[in-house]
Amino acid sequence: MYSSFSKKFRQIKPYDNYNVTDVPWHEAMVAGNGRLGVLESCAPIEDSLIYQNVEFVMPSEEPRHVPYDVTAQLDEARQSVINFDDTWNIHDRKRTNMYCYHPGHMIRLTLEGEPDISGYRRWTDYKTGTINTKFKSDGASVSKSTYVSRKQNVIITKIISEKSVNMSISIDDFESMPKFGVQKNNIPAPERNMLYSRFVRGNIIGTVVHYPEYEGSELAKGGFAGVTRILTDGDMRVSSKPKDSRAYTCIDETAPVINISHAESITLITYTDWTDDLGEYCEFRDRVNGKDTFALVDKCINKVNSVNITEEPVSLDHKNIELKLDGGYFCESANEELLDLQKNEYDIMPHLLEKLYYNGLYGMQACAGTTAPRLSGLWVGEWNLLWRSAYTMDANVNIQVSGMNSSGLYEAGTGYMWFILRQIPDWVNNAAMVYGMKDAVLVPVNTDGHRAMMVEYDINYPFQYWNAGAGWMLIPIYEFLQTYGDAVITTDDVALIKMYGKDTFDVRKDVYEPLLKKTYNFWKQIGNPEYYTDTDGNARYENGKCSLNESEHYLIIPSFSPENKPFGYHSAITANAAMDISAAKDVINMYTEMLNYTKVDGYEQAVSEAEALLRMLPDFMYDESGAVKEWSMKEYGENNAHRHISHLYPAWPALQTQHDSKLAAACRQAVINRNRENKGKDDTASHGWIHKALVEARLKNADAVYDTLNLLVHSDIFYTTLFTDHNTDRSKGVYCTDTAFGLVGIINEMLVYSDEHTIELLPAWSDKLGSGMVKGLRTRCGITIDELKWDVDKKKVYVSLDWGKTEGINVVCRNYEIEKIGHER
C-alpha cells in the first residue's frame, strides 16, 4: 500500500552523454538512514548502486575563512545605502564557495549471458525503507532488495534467484560519472587532482580515495573509502580488466572484478566513510603500491565484517501518519502512469496527491537523524551538482523541514539540531567579522556541512548583510519544544562531542536558549542611532547621534532581502528589509517569552530592555495596492518580478499574520502582486512555488494553495520515483528535494494550523480536494491529532485529540461544523 511503484527503469551507463532534462540517475530509487544512502537504478541486467555519505565534500582551493576586509567595509556599506548610492560594489569582490557534496563509489551488478527479461517492476516500500526489484530472467524469478540499516549503519542488498545465475561485480570509474572534473561554465573541478585505487581483499571489493591537497584546507590530508562485502552460495573468483584510459585519477593499471557463478543467493554489505587523516597526498601512490594499510579502509572492512545479515528492515517513524482522501487510493497504476494521467486531468488527482505526500514523508525520514536535508536530500549521482548540493538556508533547508515537527518526525528534529550545533562557532565568528558583534550569530546562505563561514557573497548576492537567517533557523527548534516539550538528545558524533565537550544535550537549555540569546544579541547590537528614520519616516544619518528620540526608529542597515533588489535600483544592499523586521520582532518576542519562563535573576529588567528594543524597530510599510512592502523605505520601489518572497516572512515561517488582520491582508496582496508580475523563466524554480504555497496556507487562502499545487502536478518536475527536480521544466537538470519534502509541510498546514493556544482545523483545505481523513499530525500546543475526518458536502468535521497534559486549548474550524471532538488523555 505505502510504496512508490514503477514499471520503468533507466540504466546508468558509464561515460554516457545525457540530455540535461533527462538524467538517468535521477530516475533511481533511494534509501537512507540520515548518514548513509544509496541510489539504485534497479536495471535488471546492469544494476547500479551509487553509495552516499552525507558528509562527503570535495575540498578545493577556495578559502576557508571570512575575508579579513569585510569588517572595514561595514561603514562603506551603510554610507552607500543611506546615500542611495547603488554603485558601491564591495570593491569588485568575487564570491567564493563552500565545498561541493560528492557521491561515493558506484557498484555495478551485471547478469551474465544476456538473459531475456520479463515481468519487470520496482518499488520502494515506504514502511521499511526498502528498494525492491522483481523480474524474470529467462523465465526464472529474480528479486532484489536494498535498504540502509539504522541499527548497523550499513547498506544491505539481497539478491535471490529461482535458478542459479552468473554475475560480475565491479566498481565503476569515478570519472565515468556525469560531470566529473567539470564545474559550471566548464571550469576545471578539484576532483581532477584526487587519487584513487580499487582493491579486492577476499570477498570484499572496495576503493580508497585521497582528496586533492590544498593549502589551508582541513581536508588536505583527507579522503574517503567505500567497501562492499559479498556473500553468496555460489562460486566466487577474482579477475581484472584493463583500466579505462579515461580514468586518469586512478593510480592502478587494472580494475578488479568479482565473478560469481551458479548462485541463487547473493548479499552485498556496504559501508563508506571519510577521514581528515589519510596521510600525505604525495605518499598515497607509494603506500598503495607498497600494499600499505589505511586505517580508514580497515575501519570500513571491520564494519562490514561485523554485520548481522539476519537483521530485517524495521518500520520507519512516519508509520503513525496516515492520509486518506475520498477518491484517493493506492491503485495499481505505476508512478509514471499516474503522472501521465494527471496531465490529462484538469483537477488534482487525490490518489496522486496521497502518493506524493507519503513519498515526501519517506524521503524526510530517509534523511533524518544526522543532519538536515541538502539541496538534493541525501543523494547525488554526479559530480559538481549545481549549487554544490549545499545546505541552503535562505529557503531550501527551511522548506524541506517545514513539515518535520507537524509530522512527528522526531529523528528529523534531532538531526536538524545537530546540523545547527555544528555551525554555531562559525556563526559567532561571522557576526564578529562582519558587524564587530560580541556573542551574536550571523548565518551564511550556505554550509557544506563541515564549515559555515561567511564567504559566499558579492554585489549581486550580498549575503554578508542577510540578517534574518539565525531567526529562521531557530524557528524549527522552537516548534520542536512546542510539539514535544522538554527533551534530551544524545549524539555519537565525535566532532560534536569534541566541540561541546559532551554527548548529551537538553534541547531547551543547551540548544534553544543559548542560540536564542545569541540571536537576540545580534538584533540588540545591529541598531545604530546614527542611522534612523525620523517622525515622518524619512531615512536619516546623523554623525555622533547617541540615542533615538521619541517616534524615531532604527534603520536596519545594511539589509538584504534574498535574492531581490528594489525596482530600478542596481544594488541589493539596502535597508529595512521586511524579512529583517519580521525576524527581529519574532526573535525579541521569543526572547521575552524565554525570560518570563526561566525567571533568571534580573529578568524583569531584561524584559523591559527587550520590549524597548521592539518599539525602536522599524514597522512594516504598505504600497499603494495594500501589499506589505519588501523594504520599509519610502525611497524604494517594489520589484515583484522575482521568484523569492522573503518579505512574506511574517506569514511563514513566522505566525505574525495570525492575529494581525491588516498584515495578513497585506501579505495576501503581496502574493497576488508576485503572481501577476513574475512570470516566465524566473518562475520555474520550484522553491518559489513551494514557498508561495506555504505562505498561502498560513494565510488560509485555500483556493490559492490549490492552484499552486495544481500547477506543480501538471508540470514536469516529478521523476518516475516521485522525487523532484529543481525546476518545473527540468531546464537545469538538478535533482532537488525541495518540492518532494515541502509538499508535506504544505499539506499539513492545509489540514491543521496550531499555535500554543489554538488548533484550527482545515484552515486552507480546498473543497476541490474532497473529503478525507488524516491521523497522527502534531501541533505546536503539544497535542496530537489522533484522527481528523471531514466531509466537504455536509461541511462537518470530526476530530479526536490526544490532549496529554495540555489545558486551555481552543479548537476552531471556520468553514466546517465541528460535529464531535473526541478526547484521549
Regions found by a protein language model. Give the residues of each.
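Active-site core of glycosidic bond-cleaving carbohydrate-active enzymes
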Residues: E46, H65, M393-N396, N405-N429, ...
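Beta-rich accessory regions
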Residues: Y2, D138-S141, V148-N153, S161-I204, ...
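Extended, hydrophobic/aromatic-rich amphipathic alpha-helical segments that build helical scaffolds
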Residues: L353-C367, A470-E479, P514-W523
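Active-site-adjacent bridging/hinge elements
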Residues: Y2-R10, G327-E337, G369-W379, M437-V455, ...
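The feature captures the catalytic groove of carbohydrate-active enzymes
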Residues: D276-L278, L375-A390, D439-K509, K524-E609
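Acidic/polar, glycine-enriched structural segments that form the non-catalytic walls/loops
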Residues: M1-Y391, Y410-T414, I420-N430, E635, ...
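Catalytic cores of secreted or luminal carbohydrate-active enzymes
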Residues: D86-D116, R121, K127, V734-D786
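Glycine- and aromatic-rich loop/turn segments at beta-sheet edges
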Residues: T371-L385, A431-V434, N528-F560, E624-S632, ...
